[in-house]
A protein has these predicted regions:
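Short, flexible helix-loop junctions that flank or precede catalytic/ligand sites
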Residues: 1-206, 210, 220, 225-226
């Protein structure tokens, strides 16, 4: 018998404790759109997302729905009504839960991981219908994230998917944990690409292909040091 254990604190750490930049707080104020937190396994994606959802939970009177595998952080009812669903315990799969999600009239939806085409399609559809949607991917840059999403789809659908992303994508946060110089622990290095008040993310996502994506993403607002 073998097992892997991960310590999850009961108390969700805030933005100040985690050292998250103000631009991430501004993303939490969005009424709708798709927000992606990316990075390798064990890079703190769940902790960042928990802080973002807790900020919304503390400030907005809305309905929050999460679909996770497994549930890591427990969100109490503050100003939001929070429903958390665990894959295999409360639902058979991410795709099944997301198909039923819109019937529950959520305002904010968390998708623990966009693993397959059906889950990615559901995330885009939920964001398109006016919900603030958070999700994770195991990618290391904004350009790689967009390519990963687009490449999941058949070739004849990829231009349509780029157009969908151009309309709903609000931000991509790429993060990793790096060792401190003094060896006392690790620090989160993060680079955030956000949609500015103009159409930066929209224009870049709509027209770029795999060859030009890295250059194009430099035209949007970038924050951080990753």
């Amino acid at each position: 018998v073998a097992a892997v254990y991960r310590t999850i604190p009961y108390e969700i750490r805030g933005f100040k404790d985690l050292g998250l930049p103000p631009v991430i707080a501004s993303i939490c104020d969005k009424p709708r759109g798709l927000v992606l937190v990316t990075g390798p396994t064990g890079s703190g994606k769940s902790t960042t997302l928990a802080a973002m959802l807790d900020k919304i939970n503390s400030e907005r009177h809305e309905h929050m729905l999460t679909v996770e595998d497994p549930i890591e952080y427990l969100h109490q009812h503050k100003k939001c009504v929070v429903n958390q669903r665990e894959v295999h315990a409360d639902t058979h799969s991410f795709s099944n839960a997301l198909r039923a999600a819109l019937r529950e009239d959520p305002d904010v939806v968390l998708i623990g991981e966009m693993r397959d085409l059906e889950t990615i399609e559901s995330a885009l559809r939920i964001a398109e219908t006016g919900h603030l949607t958070f999700a994770t991917l195991h990618t290391n840059s904004a350009a790689q994230t967009i390519n990963r999403i687009v490449d999941v789809f058949p070739a004849h659908q990829q231009s349509q998917v780029r157009a969908q992303l151009s309309l709903v994508l609000e931000g991509i946060m790429c993060q990793s944990l790096l060792p401190k110089a003094d060896g006392s622990g690790r620090v989160c290095a993060k680079r955030t690409v956000v949609r500015p008040s103009s159409s930066g993310v929209s224009d870049s996502t709509r027209v770029l292909d795999r060859a030009t994506m890295p250059r194009g993403t430099r035209s949007v607002s970038c924050h951080g040091v990753l």
